[in-house]
Amino acid sequence: EFHLEPQWADAPTAVGGVLRRRKEPDCFAVMDGGGDYIGARALGAYAPQLNAPQSLIYCVINPFRQWSDHLEHIDRTLGEILGVSHIHLEQVHILANPNTGAYTTAQEFLDGCRRVEEMISPYKPIEFACVRQQLYPQVCGDCALALLPIELYLSYDWLAVE
């Protein structure tokens, strides 16, 4: 059974039934907490479940985005998100997603991974990096991070992503 409600705007939204489903022992849920404290505020309702040992929370770092391009920005943004959501820092795992969009080059991806490592590694381990599936063969031998090839599903007409 898959529970989905389409959302057409980037707004803090919570669908019904999440708490009930999260209490099921075999529940697997993917929740997007947004890029700032406004979007993360909705996660506060789930804080007890999200802080449980079986939960895994990722903070996605894209060094090409304004809120995660410098350690100070990451610290401020993550601090605000954790403050309003009541999620414990110990629960947060870091993943790198260095991209400039659908046309990110292999070199941009590798440079972005190095930037994330330089900023984050002294403080927390980086679990893995997401790389567009088409770039994976070009970067898999040159990146120090574990890689998760991904496919883009969300696209916009003006990008003409193939």
Predicted regions and their residues:
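Active-site regions of enzymes building and remodeling cell-envelope glycoconjugates
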Residues: 124, 141-156, 162
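Conserved catalytic-core segment of NTP-binding enzymes
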Residues: 37-143
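Switch II (G3) loop of P-loop NTPases
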Residues: 1-7, 26-42
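Glycine-rich phosphate-binding loop signature in dinucleotide/nucleotide-binding domains
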Residues: 22-29, 52-53
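A short acidic, often aromatic-flanked loop/helix-cap motif at beta-alpha or helix-coil junctions
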Residues: 5-8, 101-103, 134-137, 153-159
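Residues that form generic nucleotide/phosphate-binding pockets
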Residues: 18-21, 49, 119, 153
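Residues at the C-termini of beta-strands that transition into short coil/loop
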Residues: 3, 61, 98, 151-153
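Short phosphate-binding loop-to-helix
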Residues: 5-18
